[in-house]
């Protein structure tokens, strides 16, 4: 008459799929020595696996400023959960991120788009920002790398998110002044 404990462990699926109910099926053993327990029908137990996955983004800090002499800065970007539109009849489970510079006269960005799928969702993607020389002595100039979720994104939770932009500055390499060249030859007061 002793109770036996059965422990059920939840499994993390990295999907934003809400709490999932499943059943633990208990069946009698047809091979037991006590015939009263052969093929005994025991009620199944229903269990809820609580979803702990929240859609979002992980962005590492920028490595530093860019510079007008072509100096670069980098950061990485990834999604936090497996992209899934929860519709098994489609194959449109991507999260697409568009990347652009707020001021292309100060810095450009590569790549201009990232696409996260079920197979690469957990990969950190490096984004490189390259400084541009504007040939103006304007001091260090602030600008941003703009990150936007593309309208084609259908993965649960991602289409409504807006990742944080990355702010940085471009170090000025231009200095004010003028250049005087020497004149060849002599001048004449009579001219």
Regions found by a protein language model. Name each.
Residues 1-191:
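Short boundary segments that mark the start of a structured unit
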């Amino acid at each position: 008459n002793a109770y036996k404990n059965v422990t059920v462990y939840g499994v993390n699926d990295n999907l934003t799929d809400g709490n999932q109910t499943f059943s633990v099926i208990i069946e009698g053993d047809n091979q037991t020595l006590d015939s009263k327990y052969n093929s005994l029908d025991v009620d199944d137990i229903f269990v809820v696996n609580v979803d702990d996955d929240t859609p979002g983004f992980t962005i590492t800090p920028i490595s530093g400023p860019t510079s007008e002499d072509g100096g670069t800065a980098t950061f990485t970007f990834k999604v936090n959960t497996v992209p899934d539109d929860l519709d098994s009849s489609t194959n449109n489970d991507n999260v697409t991120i568009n990347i652009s510079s707020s001021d292309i006269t100060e810095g450009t960005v590569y790549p201009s788009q990232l696409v996260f799928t079920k197979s690469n969702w957990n990969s950190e993607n490096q984004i490189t920002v390259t400084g541009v020389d504007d040939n103006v002595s304007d001091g260090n100039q602030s600008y941003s790398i703009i990150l936007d979720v593309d309208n084609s994104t259908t993965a649960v939770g991602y289409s409504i998110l807006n990742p944080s932009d990355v702010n940085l500055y471009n170090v000025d390499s231009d200095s004010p002044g003028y250049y005087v060249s020497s004149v060849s030859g002599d001048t004449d007061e009579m001219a």
